[in-house]
């Protein structure tokens, strides 16, 4: 049986990049959106604008997560680590689709800066993979912890009547917590404090810019 070469994996990652960044009319997902069967709520123009900004940030975060996993899968050494990254990336595709659908329902669209965040995250993921699988898993665990905290803040900022967005973010939060737990169980190492702070600073730059653009 032929094993995949680095070139094979690289071609696969280019295909994944196009699937992530080129917005289809409707993504193919493995799970139904948590908001699928919930009724629409009457929202003011200001509320729609604010919720759209938050969901644009969440969508950009999922683009980054997708890219991080794809970069790590490209350079991961162990087969089961590559498979774990691929499985997590598949769940992030669901998140992408849910965020996109909600943005369109609100009359908005994803961030124009997504290609920048994607490229940076792929590079970070690939470098993490080169540093070793345990370090790579450490990046996953810390990224998912920060995303979980970020989603919790957004849940606090949302109007209580916006049941659709709340349902989406709660399901995403559950998935991210599971990814972090799985990474730790697989042998993730705790990242140095300075690395965590740097990741947090980059995250703030992404969230503040994607809210508006």
Curated annotation (Swiss-Prot):
Cofactor note: Binds 2 iron ions per subunit.
Keywords, comma-separated and alphabetical: Cell membrane, Iron, Membrane, Metal-binding, Monooxygenase, Oxidoreductase, Ubiquinone biosynthesis
Subcellular location, record wording: Cell membrane
Cofactor(s) for this UniProt protein: Fe cation
Annotated metabolic or biological route of this protein: Cofactor biosynthesis; ubiquinone biosynthesis
Name this polypeptide is given: 3-demethoxyubiquinol 3-hydroxylase
Pfam families: COQ7 (PF03232)
Organism: Legionella pneumophila subsp. pneumophila (strain Philadelphia 1 / ATCC 33152 / DSM 7513)
GO biological-process terms attached to the record: ubiquinone biosynthetic process
InterPro entries in the record: COQ7_proteobact (IPR047809), Ferritin-like (IPR012347), Ferritin-like_SF (IPR009078), Ubq_synth_Coq7 (IPR011566)
UniProt: Fe cation 1 binding residues: 62, 92, 95, 176
